[in-house]
C-alpha cells in the first residue's frame, strides 16, 4: 500500500524482492493500492511531516504516535474485497496471509488476535460467498525472531538467499534519503534485536555500522526493562534488574 508513509522505500524494496523471486522461477503478481490521498487526512507520526518518529524500545508508550488510525482495518477490507473477487472469478478458495505478530500487540490494537477475529466475523456477515475466504496469521503469537527463524527454513526449502531477501526489505519508520535504516525507531530496535537473537548480522543497510546499531538497540532494550520496573536509579549488571549478580555496575544512562 502507498498511504503517504514516510518509509515508502518499502514499496521499492518489495519490487526488488518480487524481481528476485521472479528470477528464481517464482511467479508472483504484485499490485500496489494508492491510498495516499485518503490517508493523508489521518493523524500519525508515520504520515505527518509535523510529527517526529519517536525513538527507543518498541513497547514504550510514545510509540503510540506511530499508530495510523484504523490502518489494518482499511488494509484488510481492501484485501478481503480483492480476495473475494479472485475467489469468484477463479472459482476457488483464497487465503489472506498477513505477517502481523505479537511484538506489535502492546502498541497496535489492530495487530491483536481479537481484532482479526472480530473483523473476520464482520466480513463474513457483510459478504456473500464469504466461506471462500479465510485469514492465515502464522505469526499472530510469534515475534520477529520467530519470523526470522521461520524465514531461514523457508529460504533453504525454496532455494532462496536469506540475506538477499531481507536486504530487500524495510522495517525502519525513519530511513534517510538514501533508504538507509536509522536504527533508532521502535521498529528498527525490534528488528535489530531479532537478528541478534538468531546470531546473524542484518543485511539491510543502516546509517551506522552494524555493531553500533546493535549496541544502541541493546541499550534501548535495557533502558526499557529497567525503567519499566521503576528502577531508573537502580544499579544493574547486564541482566536488567538482577542487581545481586557479579559484574560491572553502572547507571542506565551513564
Give the predicted meaning of each segment:
Residues 101, 208-214:
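AMP-forming adenylation/ATP pyrophosphatase catalytic core
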Residues 179-210:
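Iron-sulfur (Fe-S) cluster-binding segments and ferredoxin-like electron-carrier domains
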Residues 27-29, 158-169, 219-227:
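Short, surface-exposed acidic
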Residues 1-162, 188:
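ATP-dependent adenylation/nucleotidyltransferase module used to activate substrates
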Residues 162-166, 174-180, 239-247:
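Short, flexible, mixed-charge glycine/proline-rich loop motifs
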Residues 218-253:
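A charge-rich, low-complexity, intrinsically flexible signal that marks solvent-exposed coils, linkers
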Residues 172, 182-185, 251:
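Short cysteine-rich clusters marking metal-coordination/redox-active sites
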Amino acid at each position: 500500500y502507498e498511504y503517504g508513509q514516510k518509509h515508502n522505500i518499502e514499496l521499492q524494496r518489495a519490487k526488488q524482492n518480487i524481481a528476485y523471486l521472479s528470477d528464481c522461477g517464482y511467479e508472483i503478481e504484485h499490485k500496489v493500492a494508492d491510498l495516499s490521498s485518503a490517508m493523508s487526512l489521518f493523524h500519525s507520526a508515520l504520515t505527518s511531516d509535523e510529527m517526529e518518529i519517536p525513538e527507543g524500545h518498541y513497547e514504550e508508550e510514545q510509540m503510540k504516535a506511530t499508530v495510523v488510525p484504523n490502518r489494518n482495518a482499511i488494509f484488510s477490507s481492501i484485501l478481503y474485497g480483492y480476495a473475494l473477487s479472485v475467489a469468484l472469478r477463479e472459482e476457488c478458495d483464497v487465503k489472506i496471509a498477513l505477517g502481523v505478530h505479537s511484538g506489535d500487540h502492546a502498541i497496535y490494537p489492530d495487530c491483536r488476535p481479537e481484532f482479526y477475529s472480530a473483523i473476520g466475523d464482520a466480513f463474513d456477515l457483510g459478504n456473500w460467498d464469504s466461506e471462500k475466504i479465510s485469514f492465515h496469521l502464522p505469526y499472530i503469537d510469534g515475534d520477529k525472531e520467530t519470523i526470522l527463524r521461520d524465514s531461514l527454513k523457508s529460504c533453504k526449502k525454496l532455494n532462496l538467499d536469506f540475506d538477499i531477501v531481507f536486504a530487500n526489505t524495510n522495517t525502519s519508520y525513519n530511513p534517510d534519503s538514501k533508504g538507509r535504516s536509522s536504527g533508532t525507531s521502535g521498529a528498527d530496535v525490534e528488528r535489530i534485536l531479532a537478528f541478534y537473537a538468531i546470531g546473524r548480522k542484518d543485511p539491510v543497510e543502516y546509517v551506522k555500522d552494524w555493531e553500533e546499531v546493535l549496541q544502541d538497540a541493546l541499550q534501548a532494550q535495557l533502558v526499557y526493562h529497567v525503567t519499566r520496573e521503576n528502577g531508573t536509579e537502580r544499579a544493574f549488571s547486564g541482566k536488567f534488574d538482577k542487581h545481586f549478580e557479579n559484574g560491572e555496575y553502572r547507571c542506565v544512562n551513564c
